[in-house]
C-alpha cells in the first residue's frame, strides 16, 4: 500500500487512477519489467476488468485500495511464475488480439507492434531450446562395450607434453608411481606457458624422483587434441588436420593416473613409443573430464582382459609380443640389475602360485628334469628346442611371450658330468626374435593397482598353457613338447637296418666310433621316443636328433619319409648333413653286433 500524507483540506488528495498509475510504473525503470500475461496466474486481474469496475469518483478510497491490492497480487504472481509458464502465457497473449496491455495508458488493446516483440521473443526461446544438446550422461558412467571395443571413445583435451621416465614403473611400488606422475604434472605445467599448474607452492622434488624423471618434450604443448580410447590403443591426434601426435598400444602402457585431489584436471599415463621411449604424457581435462578419461582407460583395459580370457588365441600374446621384444623401446632395457628378482637374490623364495605351479599343472606327465647350468643347448636343424631333445635332456627355461617360464624337477635329478657332455653339431646361435633376454624375469609386485596395465601376466600364470604351447612348438619350436612315440612300422624298419643299434647311451655310442665318417643310429635312453644319429667328424663325436617334436623326419632343407630314407639318401649320394656351419658325412656304418 502506498504511503499517504496527512490529510489537508487545502491539498488536492484525489488519487490517480489505476491506469495512470500503471503508466507511470511502466515508464519508470522498476515498473518496465511488468508484463501483461492474463492467464498465467489465478491472481492476475486484467486491466479491462479493472476499468469495468464502477468508478465511485476520484476520491473513493475503498475503490483505490481494491484496485491497488489486485495490482500487487498480479505482480507477485508474475514473479513466482516459471520461465516455461511465462513463455506459454506470452504465446497466448500474442495469439489473442483482444488481450489488453496493462502498460497501455489509454486502456485500449495492445497494438500489433507491441505484440511483435513478444512473439519474436517466444519464437527465439523455442528455437534456442530445440538447439540445446541432449543432457550428458552422469560422471563416471561406463560407455557401451561395443564402442570401446570398436572405434573407441573420443575426448577433446589439451596436450601439455611429456617427460622422460628413466626407470621401469614395474620396479616401483604404487606410492612411488603416484609421486612420479604428480611430479611429472608439476614440471610440465611449470614449463608450459599459460598452464594452470598443478601446485601453487610445492616442495622441491626428492633425489629419488629426480633420478627417475628426465628431459621433457614440449613439441605439441598447449595444443587441443582428440584423445581416442579403445581396447587397442590410446590415439592422440589434432582435431583439424588429423595429424597423429602419438599412438600408444595398450601393451606399451604401464601406468595411468588422473583426477587426484591435488590434480583434478590432469591425467598422466606412462607409455613407450619410438620417439620418446618411456615417457609420462600429460593431458589437461577441464570441467571434471579427468574422471571420465581415466574411467574410460580403465574400462578399455578391463574389456581387453575379458576378451583375452574368453578367447586367448585372438590376443597377440606370443608371436606379436615376441617380435615387439626385438625393438629396444618395448623391452625393459637396463632394468635387470635394479630389480630385486627372487632368482637373483640369495635365499629369496619365489612367490606362491607363480610360474612353477602353472607349469606343473600344464605338464603333469613330463619326464624327469633337473636344473643345471653350463650345458650346451640343443637345436634341431636351426630351431631352438631348449634342452628338451638333447641326449640327457634336463628341461631348459622356456620363453612364453614376454615371460620366463621355468619348470621344476619332478623326479630324481640326473646330472651329467661336464666332461662327458659331447659337442652338438646343430648348435647355431639363437635368433634374437625367438629368445631375447633369457635372463630377465617378471617381478611380482606386492601391491596391485587398478592401472598397472599388465593384466596378461597374471592371467598367463593361472591359465592352462597347453594350446598356446602347442602353437609355439609348431611355429618356432620354442616349447619343450614330448616327442611322439614311434609306431610299430618304424621300429620294424629300423630293426632291419644294420646301422641301428637299438637303445644305447651316448657314452657307449661314442666308444664304437673309430674314424671320421663312422655313424650309427640309436634310441635315446633318457628321452623316450627320440632317435639320435651319432657320427664322427674331425675326430669329434656329433649327435643329431632325427625326428622333430611333431614326428617328422627331416633335415634343415628336406623332409624324408623315414629314418631309413634319410640315412640311405645321404649315404648313397655322399652329401653331408649341414647344420650351423658344420658337416657330418656318412661313410662307414657301424653295424650292430649280433
Swiss-Prot record:
GO cellular component terms, semicolon-separated: cytosol; plasma membrane; synapse
SMART domains in UniProt: PTB (SM00462), SH2 (SM00252)
Key words, A-Z: Phosphoprotein, SH2 domain
GO molecular function, one term: signaling receptor binding
Lineage: superkingdom: Eukaryota
Region (Disordered): 95-147, 428-447
Ranges where the record places region CH1: 335-498
Biological process according to GO: cell surface receptor protein tyrosine kinase signaling pathway; intracellular signal transduction; learning or memory; synaptic transmission, glutamatergic
Post-translational modification: Tyrosine phosphorylated.
Domain SH2: 499-590
Domain called PID: residue spans: 149-334
PROSITE patterns, alphabetized: PID, SH2
Pfam assignment, any one: PID
Tissues with expression: Predominantly expressed in the adult brain, in the hippocampus.
InterPro entries on file: CEP152/SHC-Transforming, PH-like_dom_sf, PID_Shc-like, PTB/PI_dom, SH2, SH2_dom_sf, SHC_SH2
CDD domains with a match to the protein in the record: PTB_Shc (cd01209), SH2_SHC (cd09925)
Modified residues (Phosphoserine): 402
Stated role: Signaling adapter that couples activated growth factor receptors to signaling pathway in neurons. Involved in the signal transduction pathways of neurotrophin-activated Trk receptors in cortical neurons.
Subunit structure: Interacts with the Trk receptors in a phosphotyrosine-dependent manner. Once activated, binds to GRB2. Interacts with activated EGF receptors.
Protein name, as recorded: SHC-transforming protein 3
Natural source organism: Rattus norvegicus
GN (gene name): Shc3
Amino acid at each position: 500500500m502506498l504511503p499517504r500524507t496527512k490529510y489537508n483540506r487545502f491539498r488536492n488528495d484525489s488519487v490517480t487512477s489505476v491506469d495512470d498509475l500503471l503508466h507511470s510504473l511502466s515508464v519508470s525503470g522498476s515498473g518496465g519489467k511488468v508484463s501483461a500475461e492474463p492467464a498465467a496466474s489465478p491472481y492476475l486481474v486484467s486491466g479491462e476488468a479493472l476499468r469495468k469496475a464502477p468508478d465511485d469518483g476520484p476520491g473513493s478510497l475503498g475503490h483505490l485500495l481494491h484496485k491497488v491490492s489486485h495490482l500487487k497480487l498480479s505482480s507477485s504472481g508474475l514473479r513466482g511464475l516459471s520461465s516455461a509458464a511465462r513463455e506459454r502465457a506470452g504465446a497466448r497473449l500474442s495469439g489473442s488480439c483482444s488481450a489488453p496491455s496493462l502498460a497501455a495508458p489509454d486502456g485500449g488493446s495492445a497494438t500489433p507492434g507491441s505484440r511483435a516483440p513478444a512473439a519474436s521473443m517466444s519464437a527465439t526461446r523455442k528455437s534456442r531450446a530445440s538447439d540445446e544438446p541432449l543432457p550428458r550422461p552422469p560422471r563416471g558412467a561406463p560407455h557401451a562395450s561395443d564402442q570401446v571395443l570398436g572405434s573407441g571413445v573420443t575426448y577433446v583435451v589439451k596436450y601439455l607434453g611429456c617427460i622422460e621416465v628413466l626407470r621401469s614403473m614395474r620396479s616401483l611400488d604404487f606410492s612411488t608411481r603416484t609421486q612420479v606422475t604428480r611430479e611429472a604434472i608439476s614440471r610440465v605445467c611449470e614449463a608450459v606457458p599459460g598452464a594452470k599448474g598443478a601446485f601453487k607452492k610445492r616442495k622441491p622434488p626428492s633425489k629419488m624422483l629426480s633420478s627417475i624423471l628426465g628431459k621433457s618434450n614440449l613439441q605439441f604443448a598447449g595444443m587441443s587434441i582428440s584423445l581416442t580410447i579403445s581396447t587397442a590403443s590410446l590415439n592422440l591426434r589434432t582435431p583439424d588436420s588429423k595429424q597423429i601426435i602419438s599412438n600408444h598400444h595398450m601393451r606399451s602402457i604401464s601406468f595411468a593416473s588422473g583426477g587426484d585431489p591435488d590434480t583434478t584436471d590432469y591425467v598422466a599415463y606412462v607409455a613407450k613409443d619410438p620417439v620418446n621411449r618411456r615417457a609420462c604424457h600429460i593431458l589437461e581435462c577441464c570441467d571434471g573430464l579427468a574422471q571420465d578419461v581415466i574411467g574410460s582407460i580403465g574400462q578399455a583395459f578391463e574389456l581387453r582382459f575379458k576378451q583375452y580370457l574368453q578367447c586367448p588365441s585372438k590376443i597377440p600374446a606370443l608371436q606379436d609380443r615376441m617380435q615387439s621384444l626385438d625393438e629396444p623401446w618395448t623391452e625393459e632395457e637396463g632394468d635387470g640389475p635394479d630389480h630385486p628378482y627372487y632368482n637373483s637374490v640369495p635365499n629369496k623364495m619365489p612367490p606362491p602360485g607363480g610360474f612353477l605351479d602353472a607349469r606343473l599343472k600344464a605338464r603333469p606327465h613330463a619326464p624327469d628334469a633337473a636344473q643345471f647350468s653350463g650345458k650346451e643347448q640343443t637345436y634341431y636343424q636351426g630351431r631352438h628346442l631348449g634342452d628338451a631333445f638333447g641326449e640327457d635332456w634336463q628341461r631348459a627355461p622356456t620363453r612364453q611371450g614376454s615371460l620366463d617360464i621355468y619348470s621344476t624337477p619332478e623326479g630324481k635329478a640326473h646330472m651329467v658330468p661336464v666332461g662327458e657332455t659331447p659337442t652338438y653339431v646343430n648348435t647355431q646361435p639363437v635368433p634374437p626374435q625367438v629368445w631375447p633376454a633369457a635372463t630377465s624375469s617378471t617381478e611380482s609386485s606386492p601391491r596391485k593397482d587398478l592401472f598397472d596395465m599388465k593384466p596378461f601376466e597374471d592371467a598367463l600364470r593361472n591359465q592352462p598353457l597347453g594350446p598356446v604351447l602347442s602353437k609355439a612348438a609348431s611355429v618356432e619350436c620354442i616349447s619343450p613338447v614330448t616327442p611322439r612315440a614311434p609306431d610299430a612300422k618304424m621300429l620294424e624298419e629300423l630293426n632291419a637296418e644294420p646301422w641301428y643299434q637299438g637303445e644305447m647311451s651316448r657314452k657307449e655310442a661314442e666308444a664304437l666310433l673309430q674314424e671320421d665318417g663312422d655313424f650309427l643310429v640309436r634310441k635315446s635312453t633318457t628321452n623316450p621316443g627320440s632317435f639320435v644319429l651319432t657320427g664322427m667328424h674331425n675326430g669329434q663325436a656329433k649327435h643329431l636328433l632325427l625326428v622333430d617334436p611333431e614326428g617328422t623326419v627331416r633335415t634343415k632343407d628336406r623332409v624324408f619319409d623315414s629314418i631309413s630314407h634319410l640315412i640311405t639318401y645321404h649315404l648313397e649320394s655322399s652329401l653331408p648333413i649341414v647344420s650351423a656351419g658344420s658337416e657330418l658325412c656318412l661313410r662307414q656304418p657301424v653295424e650292430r653286433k649280433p
